């Protein structure tokens, strides 16, 4: 991710085709060592591609990924299908919560 961020920073600054040396210079300016193998792979993957198109394509792919309630609904449906097996697990969680609340011995750090 750090390599991609440096590459995009260079592209936004006007360098239309940043080299691995350019990316290394950006990373070293903030004290980060570049991973040569990953950097070369990134440069090879992005070579000749329009960054704006890649960003737009990535945004549409991210928009199609379910998040929030949809991800939580699937496990809930699976738990409802299991029936009685979910009830003991819920009781165990409640017991654990009580034990954790006793650990502060009545002194709330952020009360």
Curated annotation (Swiss-Prot):
> What does the record note on quaternary structure?
P1 and P2 exist as dimers at the large ribosomal subunit.
- Name the domain of life: Eukaryota
Q: Can you supply a Gene Ontology BP term from the record? A: cytoplasmic translational elongation
Q: Which residues carry this modification: Phosphoserine?
A: 101
- Name the chain's protein: Large ribosomal subunit protein P2
Q: Which UniProt keywords apply?
A: Allergen, Phosphoprotein, Ribonucleoprotein, Ribosomal protein
Which HAMAP family does the protein's record reference? Ribosomal_L12_arch
One of its Pfam families is Ribosomal_60s
> Looking at the record, which segments are called Disordered?
81-111
Q: What Gene Ontology molecular-function terms does this entry list?
A: structural constituent of ribosome
Function (record text): Plays an important role in the elongation step of protein synthesis.
Q: Name one GO cellular component term.
A: cytosolic large ribosomal subunit
Does the keyword field hold Nucleotidyltransferase? no
Q: Which family does it belong to?
A: Belongs to the eukaryotic ribosomal protein P1/P2 family.
């Amino acid at each position: 991710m750090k390599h991609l961020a440096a590459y995009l920073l260079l592209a936004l600054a006007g360098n239309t085709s940043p080299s691995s040396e350019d990316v290394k210079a950006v990373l070293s300016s903030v004290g980060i060592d570049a991973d040569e193998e990953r950097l070369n792979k990134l440069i090879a993957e992005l070579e000749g591609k329009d960054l704006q198109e890649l960003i737009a394509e990535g945004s549409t792919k991210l928009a199609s990924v379910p998040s929030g309630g949809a991800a939580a609904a699937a496990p809930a449906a699976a738990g409802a299908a299991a029936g009685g097996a979910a009830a003991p697990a819920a009781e165990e969680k409640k017991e654990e919560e009580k034990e954790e609340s006793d650990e502060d011995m009545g002194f709330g750090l952020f009360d």
